[in-house]
Amino acid sequence: EAESLIPFAAIATVGDVMDLTDENRILVREGLRRLQNTDNPGLKALIRVNNLENREITAYHIGFILGPCLNASGRLSTAKRALNLLLCREEREAALLAQDLKALNDSRKDMTAKGVEEAVDLVENTDLGKDRVLVIYLPHCHESLAGIIAGRIRERYTRPAFVLTDGEEGVKGSGRSIEAYHMFRELVKCRELLTKFGGHPMAAGLSLPRENVEAFRRLLNENCPL
């Protein structure tokens, strides 16, 4: 029975961007082989709705097609929707659940693209573009997409980027960094402006009062070692 879980372990390993070395590599290789001919109604339906039937499923398909569909429910709704698909035993119900997750992921992609477009517009057409550390406030952005958008902005401008959005209490956000900028260390220098924060050299999450957003942007750039 444990062997039946190998495809799920492979999806989790690739979806969490784990290194594909040692036992991870073996697990993913075997999981992909089993995924190709899975008898799990939920996985079969998800493969079908993404037009991957009769195709060799690779780590790419998990990382960029199947995984994001499963992940979208946790970002925009509740992860229970993905769990319900994986536990489903009826093909007709599985087909409906899979279509629902794909639609949710398509919505996530559209929302992300809109957020990136708004962020780029602010960088290109305001004084933000002069900053070495980009702090972009998108009040209407879904908070679960802030990190994805920050990553896209970081890639586009090769600068550390924070994307902030309105949360239930104040402003919440995520940051994505570059090798030369220790993001967590720089947040420590701004801790008096923040409600809470956490992270590591390349990424961080934070919350702060709305009235501190501009001061946070200024202080990050004043302290910036780049």
Residue ranges and their predicted role:
Residues 2-211, 215-218:
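Hydrophobic helix-and-loop "lid/oligomerization" segment in the mid-to-C-terminal part
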